[in-house]
């Protein structure tokens, strides 16, 4: 053994080849400070052994290296610039040391080689991957850029255009794509990985492969003609900005860094990378996106823990077909859990199966599936007009019409047809789980399972705990949602649960602006372009359906009359009474048609303005800051109330619910990250300015106390 630490082992193989194996004590290899130090020491030991003729890097885990240890980032990024720069420079000495060894080197890549893992393999002369490999530099998704030489080495290995596409998108690349651009040199079956890597390394040692020229290319400036470089970077800037937009600076920084470093050698190019990394690491965007990543890990960790308590789900059933039922059936079947789709009407079953078939066909068209897999998934969906096939289900998802009496009747009915220990859930967006539980003989096996529409796209599932729901029931539904590929958050029962409860105060703020004469299109523009929502409130209401919104608003008003009760008609009432339900009947705040490519098209409609003007009078202009304040303050305060009341367990879960369930702008991190960034005291002062608008604008006593103590929600958690 040449070297051994808790994360790295180096042994000498025959023919004087050193084998460095990453083998951390946890479930995955990642580049934390300890691993970087170990790699440095291992390379020193290798360099001191004069008999070594080549080096092979491998991993003892199912993944090569998943990246840097992101849990270290927030603390590290809070350090002084000099400390952060010193960390970057010291880490890069290690990667340079790997690249500068006096003999050929190769990486044998299995599973994920992401971020620092990808930067490690780029520092070796050759790269062989097996068919399980996924390679990429996802740092821009965290609001930063690669910091261990990724922007320097990748363009010199795969070319500028390919490197720009890889790094700015942050996407994992399949091994076939990596082979096509030259990021890897060979692609083999998993069982052939080490033997193929050793053969290539021996060929390099025997001078059959020119490793010196390859290495020299990575150390030198990019060989790019000046005119071609100008055109390439100008095109890239336009394309990247179009996708990333102004709120996400990291992808544009990548283009700038590679452009600035193009004429520099490795040392100069690394300095350019370090300065850009330093600048981005200090941004609020990076703090927010890293926070989302860590929150996601926390939520997934809770789901994994729930799996230990959970009842095994081998089969499922959904009651109510149609678009929603079909979406749930597709999601369950495509992730490996067979499901019965039960309805009382054959046309509804046909619609549900049609929805599942359409989603699967789209996967085949994109190359993400094939006809054989599509057939297998469809075979996992059993349509039924009676309860006979439902009897074997371990979990039942009731997804019938959003009406308490209908749901209660169906729930009572299905309880008679399933096993004693089957779990029953309701996919309701507004109806109290405690109320629905009254229709069941065994309410302990019942909870809510709120999917968001469209099911296949929206990552969130709210698992709603009723007062009688058992821990096993909740854990089993969390585990089933995770198995379906969803992110579950557990919330306690209340009107609107969590997501809808905080959404409707936002809509109330929007309605208040319209009642004061604001232009809904102007509000949408501010909330989309400036605040960063994917849709403004008017457009979102049209997509949700103003009939659905009208019903949910009534539920919220009944549940929280002191804050959400209405004294008169609002804009949602106006649209509902005019039977302008949104996209579903092609007219809401906007009017909808189909363009030449068959895609929905949104246009302003004079009728909407006439209806609103008739109710609220002449239009008037509002400043952007007031629009943002009047829509966001109610949502933020209601989110805080949910935390204080125990509806949601933590700021992290609340923020994930908002980002995954509503599309809250990720670069702002969620309500609690946004509050902490803004400063709770600053928010309280802003809310007080609008407190005269009613209860939705009045902060809680606990918020005032936190503000007075200069506290923050994540620090408190």
UniProtKB/Swiss-Prot annotation:
Active site: 450 (for 3-hydroxyacyl-coa dehydrogenase activity)
Gene3D superfamilies, alphabetized: 1.10.1040.50, 2-enoyl-CoA Hydratase, Chain A, domain 1 (3.90.226.10), NAD(P)-binding Rossmann-like Domain (3.40.50.720)
Transmembrane segments: none
Keyword Isomerase: yes
UniProt-listed GO biological process terms: fatty acid beta-oxidation
EC number: 4.2.1.17, 5.1.2.3, 5.3.3.8, 1.1.1.35
Stretch list, region Enoyl-CoA hydratase/isomerase: 1-189
Protein name, entry field: Fatty acid oxidation complex subunit alpha
The organism of origin for this protein: Shewanella piezotolerans (strain WP3 / JCM 13877)
């Amino acid at each position: 053994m040449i070297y051994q630490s808790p994360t790295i082992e180096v042994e000498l193989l025959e023919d004087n080849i050193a084998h460095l194996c990453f083998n951390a004590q946890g479930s995955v290899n990642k580049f934390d400070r300890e691993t970087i130090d170990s790699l440095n020491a291992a390379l020193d030991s290798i360099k001191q052994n004069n008999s070594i003729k080549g080096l092979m890097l491998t991993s003892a885990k199912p993944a090569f290296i998943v990246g840097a240890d992101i849990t270290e980032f927030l603390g590290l990024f809070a350090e002084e610039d000099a400390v952060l720069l010193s960390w970057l420079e010291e880490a890069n000495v290690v990667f340079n040391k790997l690249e500068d060894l006096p003999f050929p080197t190769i990486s044998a890549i299995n599973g994920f080689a992401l971020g620092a893992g990808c930067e490690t393999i780029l520092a070796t002369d050759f790269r062989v991957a097996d068919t399980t490999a996924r390679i990429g530099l996802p740092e821009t998704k965290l609001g930063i850029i690669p910091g261990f030489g990724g922007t320097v080495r990748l363009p010199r290995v795969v070319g500028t255009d390919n490197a720009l596409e890889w790094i700015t998108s942050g996407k994992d690349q399949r091994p076939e794509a990596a082979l096509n651009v030259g990021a890897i040199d060979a692609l083999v079956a998993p069982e052939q990985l080490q033997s193929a890597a050793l053969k290539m390394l021996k060929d390099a040692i025997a001078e059959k492969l020119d490793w010196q020229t390859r290495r020299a290319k990575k150390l030198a400036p990019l060989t790019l003609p000046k005119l071609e470089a100008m055109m390439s970077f100008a095109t890239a800037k336009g394309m990247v900005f179009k996708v990333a937009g102004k709120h996400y600076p990291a992808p544009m920084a990548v283009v700038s860094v590679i452009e600035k470093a193009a004429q520099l050698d490795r040392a100069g190019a690394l300095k350019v990378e370090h300065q850009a990394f330093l600048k981005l690491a200090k941004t609020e965007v990076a703090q927010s996106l890293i926070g989302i990543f860590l929150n996601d890990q926390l939520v997934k960790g809770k789901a994994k823990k729930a799996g230990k308590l959970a009842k095994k789900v081998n089969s499922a059933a959904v009651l109510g077909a149609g678009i929603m039922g079909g979406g749930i059936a597709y999601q369950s079947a495509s992730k490996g859990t067979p499901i019965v789709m039960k309805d009382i009407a054959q046309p509804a079953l046909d619609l549900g199966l049609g929805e599942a078939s359409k989603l699967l066909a789209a996967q085949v068209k994109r190359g993400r599936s094939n006809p054989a897999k599509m057939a297998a998934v469809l075979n996992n969906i059993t349509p039924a007009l009676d309860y006979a096939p439902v009897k074997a289900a371990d979990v039942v998802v009731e997804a019938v019409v959003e009406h308490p009496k209908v749901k209660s009747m169906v729930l009572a009915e299905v309880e008679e047809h399933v096993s004693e220990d089957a779990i029953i859930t309701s996919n309701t967006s507004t109806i109290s789980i405690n109320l629905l539980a009254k229709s069941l003989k065994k309410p302990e096996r019942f909870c809510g399972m709120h999917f968001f529409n469209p099911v296949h796209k929206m990552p969130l599932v709210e698992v709603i705990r009723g007062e009688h729901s058992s821990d096993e029931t909740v854990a089993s539904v969390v585990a089933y949602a995770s198995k379906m590929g969803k992110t579950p958050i557990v919330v306690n029962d209340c009107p609107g649960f969590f997501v809808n409860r905080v959404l409707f105060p936002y809509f109330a703020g929007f309605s208040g602006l319209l009642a004061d004469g604001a232009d809904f299109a102007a509000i949408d523009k501010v909330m989309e372009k400036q605040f960063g929502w994917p849709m403004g409130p008017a457009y979102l209401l049209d997509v949700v359906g103003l009939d659905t919104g009208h019903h949910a608003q009534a539920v919220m008003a009944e549940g929280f009359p002191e804050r959400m009760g209405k004294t008169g008609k609002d804009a949602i009432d106006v649209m509902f009474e005019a039977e302008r339900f949104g996209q579903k009947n092609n007219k809401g705040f906007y009017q909808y048609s189909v363009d030449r490519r068959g895609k929905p098209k949104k246009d302003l409609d004079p009728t909407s303005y006439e209806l609103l003007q008739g109710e609220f009078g002449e239009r008037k202009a509002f400043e952007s800051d007031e629009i943002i304040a009047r829509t966001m303050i109610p949502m933020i305060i209601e989110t805080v109330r949910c935390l204080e009341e125990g509806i949601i367990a933590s700021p992290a879960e609340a923020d994930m619910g908002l980002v995954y369930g509503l599309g809250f702008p990720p670069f702002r991190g969620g309500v609690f990250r946004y509050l902490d960034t803004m400063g709770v005291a600053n928010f309280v002062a802003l809310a007080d300015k609008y407190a005269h608008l009613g209860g939705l604008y009045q902060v809680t006593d606990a918020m005032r106390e936190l503000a007075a103590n200069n506290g923050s929600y994540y620090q408190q958690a």
